[in-house]
């Protein structure tokens, strides 16, 4: 749930206007607006796992500030591996008004896990981090100029190898977009690594599959199906079809790189490729989307940021993955949509039996 610990309004930046483009009313009578989302694993690992990262994180913040001055900053930034305290410096420099953080180091899983996870031994390779406890948070952050009105998050129950040292999980941030009817749900996540976990591939694959089930369960439990949904993060699926394909038919979203590779769905910045080549498996990072209500969403442009500089250096071992989406709606359809109760009650089991009251906008 949203707390002062998970959601921060940066006071010095409160006067800045949210950067969401309103495209007005096309001749067709439909309305539309656009939103850009950057997902970026910033490699904010603590020493001795990585060196020189404080300087790199500050440089990322400075680059986001430059993009803001030029009027080309992403509307939303999804950060993974934001473990270090210098992430606060990055956020301050970048100029985003709202900052939400995912599962903390001490946060624990609530509710029931996947049925087929009962036989998964939580500690099998203690020499590689399993059973040591959590040394860091999930490292997940959401930065936004549009107001964040609610936050939900949970750690993953299952992990493998060195990944178990971080409290990896998933978070959902609900945003109120100016110029759009209602709100939008945005999910950020980081799933178990493959070889970097330092345990057998079969072990890390099993943990990844169970986390995939947990991710889908979380989304289905917390998203509002009447609102557009955007998903991003480090899925750790590069060259790993056994990870990407697991329960793919049950996903409550479409993967952007797969959607845009169809001739019927052209997206600027992504050339069509042979589907047999499965170009969506060339990156660890994915974005995805879904819409079932009166406001539809689809990707329209793909871009890579924070790649190799002219000097040959990189600020992270990942590129930034930027997707621009278009949200469209017919005002008459929105007005005719069935009214919903002004109050929603959700059970809360994390700290004992309780109820969360949500006042709908």
Language-model region placement:
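Active-site-proximal segments of metal-dependent phosphoesterases and phosphodiesterases across multiple
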Residues: 191-215, 239-250
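Active-site beta-strand/loop signature of hydrolases that rely on acidic residues for catalysis
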Residues: 36-42, 60-88, 143, 173, ...
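Metal-dependent phosphoester-hydrolase catalytic domains
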Residues: 17-25, 217-230, 235-360
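Surface-exposed cleft-lining segments at the edges of enzyme active sites
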Residues: 45-49, 153-163, 191-206
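Short helix-loop capping/hinge motifs at secondary-structure junctions, enriched
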Residues: 98, 119-126, 132, 147-152, ...
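N-terminal, active-site-proximal structural segment of metallo-dependent hydrolase catalytic domains
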Residues: 2-94, 103-127, 132, 137, ...
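Beta-strand-turn-beta hairpins that frame and shape the catalytic cleft
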Residues: 24-38, 140-154, 165-192, 325-330
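Conserved beta strand-loop-helix elements of the APE1-like EEP
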Residues: 80, 93, 115, 134-151, ...
């Amino acid at each position: 749930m949203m707390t002062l610990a998970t959601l921060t309004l940066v006071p010095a930046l409160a006067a800045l206007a949210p950067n969401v483009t309103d495209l007005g009313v096309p001749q067709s009578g439909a309305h539309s607006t656009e939103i850009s989302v950057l997902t970026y694993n910033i490699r904010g690992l603590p020493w001795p796992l990585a060196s020189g990262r404080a300087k790199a994180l500050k440089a990322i913040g400075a680059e986001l500030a430059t993009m803001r001055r030029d009027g080309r900053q992403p509307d939303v930034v999804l950060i993974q591996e934001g473990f270090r305290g210098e992430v606060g410096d990055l956020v301050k420099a970048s100029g985003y008004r709202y900052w939400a953080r995912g599962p903390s180091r001490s946060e624990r899983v609530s509710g029931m896990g996947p049925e087929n996870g009962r036989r998964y031994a939580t500690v099998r390779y203690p020499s590689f981090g399993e059973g040591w406890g959590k040394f860091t948070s999930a490292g997940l952050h959401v930065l936004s100029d549009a107001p964040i009105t609610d936050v939900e998050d949970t750690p993953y129950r299952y992990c493998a190898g060195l990944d178990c040292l971080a409290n990896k999980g998933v978070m959902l941030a609900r945003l109120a977009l100016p110029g759009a009817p209602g709100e939008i749900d945005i999910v950020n996540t980081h799933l178990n690594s493959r070889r970097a976990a330092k345990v057998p591939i079969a072990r890390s694959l099993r943990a990844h599959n169970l986390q995939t089930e947990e991710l889908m369960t979380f989304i289905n439990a917390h998203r509002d199906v009447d609102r557009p949904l955007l998903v991003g993060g480090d899925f750790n699926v590069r060259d790993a079809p056994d990870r990407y394909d697991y329960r793919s038919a049950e996903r409550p979203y479409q993967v952007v790189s797969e959607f845009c590779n169809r001739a019927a769905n052209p997206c600027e910045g992504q050339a069509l490729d042979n589907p047999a080549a499965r170009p969506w498996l060339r990156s660890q990072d994915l974005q995805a989307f879904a819409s079932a209500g009166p406001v539809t969403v689809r990707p329209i442009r793909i871009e890579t940021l924070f790649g190799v500089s002219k000097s040959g250096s990189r600020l992270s071992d990942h590129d930034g993955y930027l997707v621009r989406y278009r949200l469209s709606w017919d005002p008459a359809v929105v007005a005719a949509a069935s009214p919903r109760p002004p109050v929603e009650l959700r059970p809360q089991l994390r700290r004992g039996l309780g109820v969360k009251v949500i006042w709908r906008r």
